[in-house]
Amino acid sequence: METSTSSSQSLIPLPMSKKDYSSEIICAFDIGAKNPARTVLEVKDNSVRVLDISKLDWSSDWERRIAQDLSQYEYTTVLLERQPRRSPYVKFIYFIKGFLYHTSAAKVICVSPVMSGNSYRDRKKRSVEAFLDWMDTFGLRDSVPDRRKLDDVADSFNLAMRYVLDKWNTNYTPYNRCKYRNYIKKM
């Protein structure tokens, strides 16, 4: 099952074609077999535009499906969530790196998950909260499907937004490393 949210809305609306070389196209993957997710953002002239947020399915025929997902845009940067050494999902990372090595000028970067500290459940909850806050900011909250399992798309979106904000040297509180036991989101 593949669901997708695409939008031409941004903080500052700008017309854009698929091959606009003055912009940067950032793709972030939350890796997994049953619930991988992809976010594609365009960064141009200090504005960010959400091009696509998709929940993907790589459970069968994963090589063809990943190749299809990678061929939809001309990315300048591809972000992959770092996996533990013996994870069964490491094969996806190597496949993506190999696929883009000769076919694209995109940089492929493995990054740590955005949320850290506390329990797995707490990290996922904070990730979804930050994602929904960003969807409100972009005016896309109505496009987000009502479902319980939003943490995969939230993680991919937060990977992409953290990358953009780091490039702009912008601090966003939910993305800060939190060592406190009782993290309370204050915005």
UniProtKB/Swiss-Prot annotation:
Free-text comment on the cofactor: Binds 1 Mg(2+) ion per subunit.
UniProt entry keywords in alphabetical sequence: DNA damage, DNA recombination, DNA repair, Hydrolase, Magnesium, Nuclease, Phosphoprotein
Function according to Swiss-Prot or TrEMBL: Plays a role in DNA replication by cleaving viral DNA concatamers to yield unit-length viral genomes. The concatamer junctions contain inverted repeat sequences that can be extruded as cruciforms, yielding Holliday junctions that A22 protein cleaves.
GO molecular function, one term: nuclease activity
Catalytic activity, EC: 3.1.-.-
Lineage: Viruses, Varidnaviria, Bamfordvirae, Nucleocytoviricota, Pokkesviricetes
Catalytic EC class: hydrolase
Organism this protein belongs to: Monkeypox virus
Family note: Belongs to the RuvC family. Poxviruses-type subfamily.
Cofactor(s) the protein needs: Mg(2+)
SUPFAM superfamilies in the record: Ribonuclease H-like (SSF53098)
Top-level taxon of the source organism: Viruses
Keyword check for Magnesium: yes
Pfam families registered for this protein in UniProt: Pox_A22
Name this protein carries in UniProt: Resolvase OPG149
GO-annotated biological processes: DNA recombination; DNA repair
